[in-house]
Every structure is written in C-alpha cells, then in structure tokens.
Amino acid sequence: MTVFADHDAYIAAAPEALQPLLAFVRARLAQTLPDAEEIIRYDMPGFGSAGLIIAGYAAFSKQCGLYVSKGAISAYSDDIAAAGLKASKTGVTFSPSKPIPDELIAALALASRKELGV
C-alpha cells in the first residue's frame, strides 16, 4: 500500500487521465472550505477541521469519488441524480467524461461542514 505525504503526491500517483479532475476538485474544496486543513486520512486526501473529515476525494482506475457526510448526500440527492451521477451513502462517483459540477462540489462540502458542526 502506498502512503501519500500530501495531496500533491496523491494526485501525481493517480491515473494521468484523472489528475486534472482531482486537481479541480481539490481547488474547489480549498476555495469552499478556506479554514479547513488539507489532510490525508484512510489513504485519501481530504479537508478537515477539529479532527473531523469534512470532505475527501479519491481516484480509482477510471473514475473519481467525492466523499462527504451522509446528510450532505441526502440533502443533494436530487442534484446528484440530475447531474447523471451515482451516489452511495457518503460519496459521489464521477469521471472525466461526466465530471461533477463545480457548484455541486461546493454545496456538498458546505452541507457536510454544517452537519459536522465545524
């Protein structure tokens, strides 16, 4: 298992086709959560505060995932479906051919932060 020192190392190790998408998600999360710190937890990059993970992201072989609180996914389930994306209890998967909308990244991150109370 590879241990990543930081977000840059994680993105650099991801499949080349996914790197721009990961960089975009990272930038949007950083903009949306300016007071959160960049963290690596469970071998994934994320943004956290007060020891909690507000939002994280990951790369797989052909797609990426954005991971937030269960309540955030529930609150935006219609928006996720309208974007043609698939959601689990705590995540949304997307690909370069069907990226996650900019405003959905922000909405999910803010809803997750609110639910966590940080």
Language-model region placement:
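Charge-dense, helix-prone N-terminal extensions
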Residues: M1-V118
